[in-house]
Structure formats: structure tokens, C-alpha cells
Amino acid sequence: MAVRVGINGFGRIGRQALKALLDRHTDDIEVVAINDLFDTATNAHLFKYDSNYGVYPGDVEARESSFVVDGREIAVVAERDPGAIPWKKFGAQIVIESTGLFTDATKAKAHLSAGADKVIISAPARNEDITIVLGVNQERFDPARHNVISNASCTTNGLAPVAKVLFDRFGIQRGLLTTVHSYTNSQRLLDVASRDLRDARAAALNIVPSETGAARAVGLVIPELQGRFGGMSLRVPTSTVSIVDFTAVLDREATKDEINAAMREYSKDSMLGILGYTEEPLVSSDLKGDSRSSIFSGLDTLVVGNLVKVLSWYDNEYGYACRLSDITAFVARQLNGKTSANGSILKEIVGDPGMWGKNPRLRDRDSAASTTATATSKE
């Protein structure tokens, strides 16, 4: 029986999360309601037409108090107070909290009071019961104790799998992260007054140094690394796809081949669908729509003794939304008491993304474009 899910906040991540849920988890999950303050027609339009990922190929219909996606009707409400959202009426067992406003679990718990059993926050959180990065620490989830769960940030999901491989195989004494991150809606289109004078500047015209807690957050999912990492962000003029630039001092010397071999091995086994591996000379747009948390670039590994620098790509919107959908399915299976016969519940949920990890709609679109281009070149 599918677990019923509600979404609070239908912005960039909320919309991509719904697409990912519909692409990946219709057997485990039924999305029954969305709470958002914008009108239904606007939300349906923005779901259908996306500047980063193109036009949703299915049917989308806006109604007065719901919208219908591919024949599935989803109720829509508009409540400012999460405690006033009628989750109980809709039977929502899990709520995805993606407004960005209720990242403190003391506030997010209002969803529980409104009838939900579990809340998954699509951001780094405070006072949460547990932070989970799939592929790294999901085995620590206890459905009896953990009711408010953080999916961490897109950058923590991009770094943590890479850090885990390095830590498991070589040990890590300390590390520094720079995430070269696409701009987001929190930034300014043009210069405007702000207390943060860098954040005041036009996002599409500048490289903007900024803070990130992603490196420190790795210690939440790999406790042995608590306090060993620091980091910063460089916001750049691209609309999606970012890259982790991670420098670490290892416990022992390693070679480029050893590090790449370890990443390749994990990407094909315990982190299949989470960690990707490539030695292709890719650029950021090549990774748009990739469903994996982190795609390691073996071409760029640098080593000097026990000092290493590695790069790993991630689609900070769709890739993160896929993990958000996957962790929702993971929690849903726990609520239903489902276990895997061979213990590989994560592999069943995430699946094998294939070489590129593209979602089916984007993969089919790109294949069609490639076929058309080939045919044109022969004419």
C-alpha cells in the first residue's frame, strides 16, 4: 500500500521533488496534497514549464483547489502556519518540508501536530532527530525515534559520499571544501542594498564568495570526521549544476589511480545511484538532470603524497530532489515495515541510473535530440 505524502512549499525544490517522486516512486508513494501560498494556476504553470529542465511532457491541469498531473489529482491548500495544514484530513503520513522557512525542528514539528507521522526537511536543520545522507548513514535511521529528519543540503550530499570513500580507504586527518555553486533564488538579480555586501551584488554578473555549512555538516553523518572540515562557497553565474572541490590530508600516501579506483568501486556497488564516476572531460551543462548525489571526476584528481584534491559534480536542484524523493521512499518503506530480502533496500529505492543517471524524461529528450542531430548531419 502506497504511503500518502504531502509537500509544504512548492518552489524550486518542491516542484522538482514532485517530478522525482512521479518518475521514481509511484509504487511506494502517493502525493495527496501540496501547501503553498501561490495560486494553483501559477504553481501548475511553473511545474509544467521549467527554464532549467524544459517542459514536463505529461498532462498538467489546474483546478480551483487542486491540480492534476498525469491523471493524479493532488489537493492544494494555502496555509501560512504549518500547524493549520489539514494533513490529517488528507491522510498524509509523511510531509516534505521544502519552504526553507521551517528548518528548525521545533517549528517543523507543527506538521506532526497537524496529523503527519514524519517530517523530512529539504535543508540543513536545527534540533532535528537525525540528518541522513543516503549512501552514507541511512542505516542509523530508527523509525521509532526519528520523526523529524533532515536531508542535509545539496552540497553535503555532494561531498559526504566522496568523503566517506576517502575516509574508509585512506583515512582523513582534515579537509577543506570549496563548492563552486550555481546561483539560487536567495541571491539578487541586480545590485541591491543588503547587510551582506557580497550577497547584495548581481548573481548573474559575478562570482560571489559566500559561507557554507556543508563541510561541517559531514560530521553529522560521519561522526568520526566531526570538527575536521571547513569550507566556503563560490556562487557563480550558472542556473544549476555545481561542483565540489575538496582538498584533504589523508592518513597515508595514496596515488591518483588508487583514489580513482576506490571511487569507481563504490560507484558500482554500495553507492550505486548515489556516487557516479567519470573520466570524460565534462563541463557543468553535461550534468544537468543527473539524478546522482555526486559524480566524481577522475580526470581531475591531484595527489602530492598524502595531500589530495578531488572534484565531484552535482545537480544541486534535480539531483538533490531525487535524494529527497528517495529518502521519502526510504522512510515510507520503514513505515510499511518493508525490508529487502538481501538487505539492499537502498539499491532498490535508488536503482541503477545507468551511465548518466538522467531521469527518464530528460534521457528520452536527449536521445531524441541526438537522433535528430545525427539524421540532420547525414542529409
Model features per residue range: what roles?
Residues 291-369, 373, 378-379:
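NAD(P)-dependent Rossmann-like dehydrogenase/reductase catalytic/cofactor-binding core
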Residues 40, 126, 215, 317-318:
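Alpha-helix N-cap/helix-start and coil->helix boundary motif
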Residues 4, 23-86, 171-174, 179-308, ...:
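C-terminal substrate-binding/catalytic lobe of Rossmann-fold NAD(P)-dependent oxidoreductases
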Residues 157, 253-254, 318-319:
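A generic structural signal for alpha-helix starts
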Residues 12, 16, 20, 110, ...:
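Alpha-helical scaffold segments in soluble metabolic enzymes
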Residues 36, 106, 117, 156-159, ...:
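Intrinsic structural disorder
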Residues 99-100, 154, 210, 251, ...:
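Structured loop/turn residues at secondary-structure junctions
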Residues 1-200, 302, 326, 334-338, ...:
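N-terminal Rossmann-like NAD(P) cofactor-binding subdomain of oxidoreductases
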